[in-house]
């Protein structure tokens, strides 16, 4: 029996660092959306008690450092599963890009194993497992437009956004999320008004939404990688309604109210970076 799951990428329309918790992690407030740039996870059972991962990508580890392996290992141990599993990852989401590729693959693995082994986990049980792996995994279990709070474990669905076009630009380097979070100074970091952004979404006010979007991590990443600022400027000069880094970077995305605008931004960036994508929001 094979189980097939689609694993969509995510974007941060808003990412605010509210402070540092006593355990060293940060309290977050984020608004996230899913886009139609997808990885695909195919899972089948093995007789041997092991976890085997293979992929069409050579840009990530296929051992216990992979979030997919961690998801399978936690579930096997938690539910006393003595069977093995083969996990095939077909990658389209760039690695170490701020698009949640590892997190969405882990979430897809949790959903798939729940079906394969008939574990009958409810959403909260899957979230608890996902949160052990990473702060974006709980969101990726359900996706869509959502408010994400705490350390990532609190996910509250929001209304679907109006249709629009997204252009993604991924520079030719990756970013370590841990290294960016290590450099956060909660006293001086730029803040994002997530409540205002949420209000704009609830009232379907597109203009207010794009004005309210922001990312507290952007300045830190730009200090290390100034090309991100150049990408934003080029996108805005090409007619993007907004240009913003997602996650800890380095991917920059623009939102465009029409496909014509998106095509103009896309064409302006193709000669500047190798990895440029035109996608839609998932509804």
Curated annotation (Swiss-Prot):
Alphabetical GO biological process terms: terpenoid biosynthetic process
A Pfam match: GHMP_kinases_N
Xref: InterPro entries: GHMP_kinase_C_dom (IPR013750), GHMP_kinase_C_sf (IPR036554), GHMP_kinase_N_dom (IPR006204), IspE (IPR004424), Ribosomal_Su5_D2-typ_SF (IPR020568), Ribsml_uS5_D2-typ_fold_subgr (IPR014721)
Entry keyword annotation includes Nucleotide-binding: yes
Keyword terms: ATP-binding, Kinase, Nucleotide-binding, Transferase
Binding site for ATP: 94-104
Coiled-coil ranges (or none): none
One MF term in the entry's GO annotations: 4-(cytidine 5'-diphospho)-2-C-methyl-D-erythritol kinase activity
EC number: 2.7.1.148
Annotated catalytic residues: 10, 136
Reaction(s) catalysed (UniProt annotation): 4-CDP-2-C-methyl-D-erythritol + ATP = 4-CDP-2-C-methyl-D-erythritol 2-phosphate + ADP + H(+)
Tagged with keyword Kinase: yes
Entry's family note: Belongs to the GHMP kinase family. IspE subfamily.
Biological role: Catalyzes the phosphorylation of the position 2 hydroxy group of 4-diphosphocytidyl-2C-methyl-D-erythritol.
Name of the protein: Putative 4-diphosphocytidyl-2-C-methyl-D-erythritol kinase
Organism: Streptococcus agalactiae serotype III (strain NEM316)
Lineage of origin: Bacteria, Bacillati, Bacillota, Bacilli, Lactobacillales
């Amino acid at each position: 029996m094979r189980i097939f799951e689609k694993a969509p990428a995510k974007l941060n329309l808003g990412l605010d660092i509210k402070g540092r918790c006593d355990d060293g992690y940060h309290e977050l407030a984020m608004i996230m959306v899913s886009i139609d740039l997808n990885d695909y996870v195919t899972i089948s059972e093995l007789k041997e008690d092991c976890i085997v991962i293979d992929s069409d990508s050579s840009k990530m580890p296929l051992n216990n450092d992979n979030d997919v392996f961690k998801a399978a290992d936690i579930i096997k141990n938690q539910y006393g599963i003595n069977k093995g599993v083969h996990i095939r990852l077909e990658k389209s989401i760039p690695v170490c890009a701020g698009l949640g590729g590892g997190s969405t693959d882990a979430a897809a693995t949790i959903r798939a194993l729940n079906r394969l082994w008939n574990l009958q986990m409810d959403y909260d049980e899957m979230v608890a497992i996902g949160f052990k792996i990473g702060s974006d995994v709980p969101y990726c279990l359900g996706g869509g437009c959502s408010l994400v709070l705490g350390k990532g474990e609190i996910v509250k669905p929001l209304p679907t956004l109006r249709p629009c076009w997204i252009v993604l630009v991924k520079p030719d380097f990756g970013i370590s999320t841990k290294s960016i979070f290590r450099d956060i100074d909660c006293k001086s970091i730029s803040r994002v008004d997530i409540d205002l952004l949420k209000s704009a979404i609830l009232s379907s006010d597109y203009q207010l939404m794009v004005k309210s979007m922001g990312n507290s991590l952007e300045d830190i990443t730009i200090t290390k990688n100034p090309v991100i600022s150049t990408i934003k400027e080029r996108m805005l000069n090409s007619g993007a309604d907004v240009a913003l880094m997602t996650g800890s970077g380095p991917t920059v995305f623009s939102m465009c109210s029409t496909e014509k605008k998106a095509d103009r931004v896309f064409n302006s960036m193709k000669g500047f970076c190798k990895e440029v994508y035109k996608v839609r929001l998932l509804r």
